[in-house]
From Swiss-Prot:
One of its GO terms (cellular component) is plasma membrane. This is Tetrahydromethanopterin S-methyltransferase subunit D. It comes from Methanosarcina mazei (strain ATCC BAA-159 / DSM 3647 / Goe1 / Go1 / JCM 11833 / OCM 88). Its main location: membrane. It comes from the Archaea. It catalyses: 5-methyl-5,6,7,8-tetrahydromethanopterin + coenzyme M + 2 Na(+)(in) = 5,6,7,8-tetrahydromethanopterin + methyl-coenzyme M + 2 Na(+)(out). It is an enzyme of class 7 (translocase). GO terms for molecular function: tetrahydromethanopterin S-methyltransferase activity.
Length: 250
């Protein structure tokens, strides 16, 4: 057990880094919750965990698919990031269409007077009694950045767990079988999803409701969530490495 941990310190560090990136990335994602669903708050009308998990799982699937065709680490991580970015971008743009053409409101933020990216006035278009509505440009860009961080983090965790399985398998039988189709790939994926969910839930308590993106005052709370995620990711990494080692590796 101790040997398994000491022999996979590098991959455990990558798992922790991945968890931190996920936690940090969640703070970038514009989440409006139930108020946004009624066009009374800026962001996507769903919860923090649901939105972050959707992007993260898409990134994990993209990274897993890329591992079928290459073992190039940068390509695998980039694939995870792009997959997550596409998912969150499509979600936000479709949401914007509904807000604009369905509800009939202009995407605007109540947190800033001027959009930091487009420099367009925001306060003129915020309806009375609301905290903004739709997904303005700054929130869209922020969401794509957050998805990229989440995708990279999820890919790091998944890749690291696969490498742990491969290294344990090499030590036990002297030769490793193909990763594709191996039963422990499912175990690694489940652990990766679990670690992702843990690090997505922590920021949701930190945010405490809605957040518009990196321009939102709540974004400044991210260091607290990151510290908590480091601790949680260490525990998750230890459990995951021990479990995969005890199962015999890949």
């Amino acid at each position: 057990m101790i040997d398994a941990i000491l022999g996979n310190i590098l991959w455990m560090v990558f798992i922790i880094i991945g968890g931190v990136l996920i936690s940090w990335g969640v703070h970038f994602v514009p989440v409006g919750g139930a108020p946004a669903a009624m066009a009374q708050a800026t962001g996507v009308g769903t919860g923090t965990v649901q939105l972050a998990t959707g992007a993260g799982l898409t990134g994990l699937v993209s990274a897993g698919f890329m591992m079928n065709v290459t073992d190039n680490f940068p390509l695998i991580v980039a694939s995870g990031a792009v997959g997550a970015m596409i998912m969150i971008a499509v979600t936000m743009i479709v949401g914007t269409w509904i807000y604009v053409y369905g509800v009939g409101c202009v995407p605007s933020s109540a947190k800033v007077k001027v959009d930091p990216i487009t420099k367009y006035r925001q306060d003129l278009y915020v309806s009375q009694g609301t905290e903004g509505h739709g997904i303005p440009t700054v929130s869209f860009v922020s969401g794509v950045i957050g998805a990229a961080l989440g995708g990279i983090g999820g890919s790091l965790i998944y890749y690291s767990l696969i490498e742990v399985g491969v290294s344990v398998g090499l030590e036990r039988v002297g030769v490793t079988s193909a990763v594709t189709g191996n039963s422990l790939v499912a175990v690694a994926a489940i652990f990766a999803i679990g670690i992702f969910l843990v690090n997505a839930v922590i920021p949701s308590y930190n945010i405490g409701g809605t957040i518009e993106g990196f321009h939102d005052p709540k974004f400044k709370k991210w260091p607290k969530a990151v510290i908590s995620s480091v601790v949680a990711s260490i525990l998750c990494a230890i459990v995951a490495v021990i479990a995969i080692a005890q199962l015999g590796g890949i």
